């Protein structure tokens, strides 16, 4: 199972009332969303400074990319039947951002990276996460990052700013280079500047979006047999 502790972004009106999760008034939108005036905000900002003290060391599926990792922040699209169809990813609850820390049990340090999920229907085989390294490499690399990585208990920070249609990401840590990325969330150009033909051409343009500060452990533990 994936154990988790999350703080979900919610909005309140001028009287302190929290709108329904079925209302755009409890989500933010990209600037190019055709109904952007119905949302609580255009764009969003999320910042955190944190330390990861523990990750799973006993993963049943140790060869799977999420093993030995923890999600420490994300932006999520809402799961909404009215938006959902078999052509686009709108309404399927995909994630334009998941920030990971991953450390193998025998490694000195761990890696920090972020993933962008192609915005496609749930049963589309092309729907996958694209990893972008921050310190160390992405989740497919099992080499020890050594001094380039982040140790357990070592502090690092991230700042995520969705402005207009673009998501700006800044990662910083003492004795490590500051790393910046950006990606337009309303087209299918990836964070390296290349067109991704598998992604929806307008990416997350029409989705209802919200942020999460999270600690989600991505490992299925091997349970003892009796």
Where are these regions (language model features)?
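Short, aromatic/His-centered strand-loop micro-motif at the edge of beta-sheets
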Residues: 107, 115-157, 178
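A signal for specific C-terminal beta-sheet/loop modules enriched in small/flexible residues
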Residues: 2-22, 131-139, 143-145, 178-206
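Beta-strand secondary-structure signal
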Residues: 45-49, 157-159, 168
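Secretory/extracellular carbohydrate-interaction modules
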Residues: 1-122
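Intrinsically disordered, low-complexity segments enriched in small/polar residues
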Residues: 98-99, 114, 130, 156, ...
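Surface-exposed coil/turn segments at beta-strand junctions on protein surfaces, enriched
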Residues: 39-41, 149-153, 162
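Aromatic sugar-binding interfaces of carbohydrate-active proteins
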Residues: 148, 161-226
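Generic structural motif
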Residues: 112-116, 160, 169
């Amino acid at each position: 199972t994936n154990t988790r502790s999350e703080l979900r972004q919610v909005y309140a009106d001028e009287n302190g009332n929290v709108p329904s999760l079925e209302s755009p008034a409890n989500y933010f939108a990209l600037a190019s969303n055709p109904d952007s005036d119905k949302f609580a905000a255009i764009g969003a900002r999320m910042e955190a400074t944190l330390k990861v003290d523990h990750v799973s060391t006993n993963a049943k599926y140790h060869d799977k990319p999420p093993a030995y990792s923890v999600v420490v922040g994300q932006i999520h699209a809402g799961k909404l039947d009215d938006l959902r169809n078999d052509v686009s990813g709108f309404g399927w609850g995909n994630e334009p951002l998941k920030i990971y820390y991953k450390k193998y049990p025998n490694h000195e340090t761990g890696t920090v990276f972020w993933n962008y999920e192609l915005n496609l229907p749930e049963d589309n085989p092309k729907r996958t996460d694209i990893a972008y390294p921050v310190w160390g490499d992405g989740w497919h690399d099992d080499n020890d990052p050594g001094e380039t990585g982040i140790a357990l208990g070592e502090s690092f920070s991230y700042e995520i700013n969705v402005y207009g249609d673009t998501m700006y990401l800044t990662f910083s840590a003492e004795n490590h280079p500051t790393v910046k990325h950006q990606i337009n969330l309303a087209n299918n150009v990836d964070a390296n500047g290349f067109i991704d033909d598998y992604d929806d051409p307008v990416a997350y343009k029409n989705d209802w979006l919200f942020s999460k500060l999270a600690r989600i452990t991505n490992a299925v533990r091997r349970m003892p047999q009796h």
